[in-house]
Amino acid sequence: MTELKNDRYLRALLKQDVDKTPVWMMRQAGRYLPEYKKVRAQAGDFMSLCRNADLACEVTLQPLRRFDLDAAILFSDILTIPDAMGLGLYFAEGEGPKLKRPITCKKDVDNLIMPDPEGELQYVMNAVRTIRRELKGSVPLIGFAGSPWTLATYMVEGGSSKAFTKIKKMAFCEPQLLHTLLDKLADSVIDYLNAQIAAGAQSVMVFDTWGGVLSPRDYKDFSLQYMTKIVAGLQRSYEGQKIPVTLFTKNGGQWLEAIADTGCDAIGLDWTIDMASAKARVGDRVVLQGNMDPSMLYATPERIRQEVATILASFGKGNGHVFNLGHGIHLDVPPENGKVFVDAVHELSMPYHV
């Protein structure tokens, strides 16, 4: 394999010395970039873009041409697994993801296909292989999947939700059925991420977007225990290289200590938690990723730089920080503000690594 020219991100995840704090942005490839919109139009629809390895590679690389990012992240969607399980993923204009055949009963769970990463999901692995080749060792490639709980919310609700009544009804009225579903999803995520690692992903991330809608007890029962299972099942080294894993629960600040106990290498933080208090709570057990409010990218360059400086000071000196937004970049953010953000992280973090 090609030697990495910039391994700052991987070094930070392994708590090794870096010259400056590494930075990437969740959803860095996407609709805020005019060049992305052109490729998306060329593909016809979102899933056609995901299924075309060359186009998925192109949009993955686009932000790296604009910004001095320390990592690339696979362009895909967390709902590829439910789609491959037979639920029929589609995107309604202006409404987000929908599933044609949501889960309503035990029979639906029993009938789920356990997807083969090199079968139904081979298009994702082809994209990973293509991106890894085209990166030519410039920066590492991050693979990812949704958490079992988050995937289950879409599979039971049939799409996005505000109140999560259907999945919570299942959790509280038929908990064993939900546990059966979550267990199947955990097994599928393990297979999927290990296949991404074999195809070339150098780090992986699990997105638990909706874990934060659960009570503390229910979070541990229905989300955290399945992410713990995933961490235990992942291939943590490949071809002599360690493969770090990051867990991210949006609105998960109250559970940092428990997330650190999963055995993950890093925890993603959203902007609702103070970086200094997060660091004080988990110590040096895990690396912290985050955590600027993505809406800060609407602000002036001066204000963006000020916020970056504040978060860097909050983390303080030393290693173990990957800078990121606290969630995905908004679709109407001016791209030039992304550059201000990335450049500010590199420039202002150098004194913390002397």
UniProtKB/Swiss-Prot annotation:
Pfam families: URO-D. The keyword Repeat does not apply. InterPro entries: UROD/MetE-like_sf, Uroporphyrinogen_deCO2ase_HemE, Uroporphyrinogen_deCOase. It comes from the Bacteria. The keyword Cytoplasm applies. Substrate binds at R27, Q28, A29, G30, R31, D77, Y154, T209, H327. GO terms for cellular component: cytosol. It catalyses: uroporphyrinogen III + 4 H(+) = coproporphyrinogen III + 4 CO2. GO terms for molecular function: uroporphyrinogen decarboxylase activity. It is an enzyme of class 4 (lyase). Pathway: Porphyrin-containing compound metabolism; protoporphyrin-IX biosynthesis; coproporphyrinogen-III from 5-aminolevulinate: step 4/4. Transmembrane segments: none annotated. It is found in: Cytoplasm. The record marks D77 as: Transition state stabilizer. Keywords: Cytoplasm, Decarboxylase, Lyase, Porphyrin biosynthesis. Belongs to the uroporphyrinogen decarboxylase family. NCBIfam families: hemE (TIGR01464). Catalyzes the decarboxylation of four acetate groups of uroporphyrinogen-III to yield coproporphyrinogen-III. Homodimer. This is Uroporphyrinogen decarboxylase. It comes from Psychromonas ingrahamii (strain DSM 17664 / CCUG 51855 / 37).
